[in-house]
Every structure is written in C-alpha cells, then in structure tokens.
C-alpha cells in the first residue's frame, strides 16, 4: 500500500540535515548514508549518495528521474550468480 499524500515523503532527519548543508556549501562530496528507506526529494537533485547495501557503499547520483523513489532501490543487496547448470552446458557440448 502506498504512503498517504497528506503525510508527505519520508526522509530521515540526519539525511535531510546533510542535504541542506551540502546544498548551502555547494559541496560535491558524496553523502554517506545507511538510510535506504529515505525518499528522494527535489532538494537532492545533483547530489551523490553512498548508500549502504549491507556489505559496502554504492554511489547513487540523483537526477530528476529518481524523484519519488527510495535510496535503497538503487543499491541492490543481492548478487545473482546464475542458476546451476549441468557440466555439459558449461563446456559447450
């Protein structure tokens, strides 16, 4: 179920403080965050976030197309190695 429009987008307070400080200082350093649940809002356009995926940090550059999504959607947490195949398929028959 989607979030109610009257509530507005959710952004963690510590992320919002860092965004406003980076915009005021015109700073291009990436903002390191573990807050995958924070929604991307228009104030974040042009900033780079290092989003934690459980193991490391994935750089996410925010553009206009990202507005309305969450930061965690752009930092995958799982790596797909492929389904197990037979030995003959790997050799090439």
Swiss-Prot record:
GO terms for molecular function: rRNA binding; structural constituent of ribosome. GO terms for biological process: ribosomal small subunit assembly; translation. Gene3D superfamilies: 30s Ribosomal Protein S19, Chain A (3.30.860.10). SUPFAM superfamilies: Ribosomal protein S19. Pfam families: Ribosomal_S19. InterPro entries: Ribosomal_uS19, Ribosomal_uS19_bac-type, Ribosomal_uS19_CS, Ribosomal_uS19_SF. Keywords: Ribonucleoprotein, Ribosomal protein, RNA-binding, rRNA-binding. The keyword Ribonucleoprotein applies. One of its GO terms (cellular component) is small ribosomal subunit. HAMAP family: Ribosomal_uS19 (MF_00531). Belongs to the universal ribosomal protein uS19 family. This is Small ribosomal subunit protein uS19. The lineage of its organism: Bacteria, Pseudomonadati, Campylobacterota, Epsilonproteobacteria, Campylobacterales.
């Amino acid at each position: 179920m989607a979030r109610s429009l009257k509530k507005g987008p959710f952004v963690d307070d510590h992320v919002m403080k860092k965004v406003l400080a980076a915009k005021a200082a015109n700073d291009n350093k990436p903002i390191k965050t573990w807050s995958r649940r924070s929604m991307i809002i228009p104030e974040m356009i042009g900033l780079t976030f290092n989003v934690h995926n459980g193991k490391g940090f994935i750089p996410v550059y925010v553009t206009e197309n990202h507005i309305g999504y969450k930061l965690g959607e752009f930092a995958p947490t799982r790596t797909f190695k492929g389904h197990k195949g037979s030995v003959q398929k790997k050799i090439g028959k």
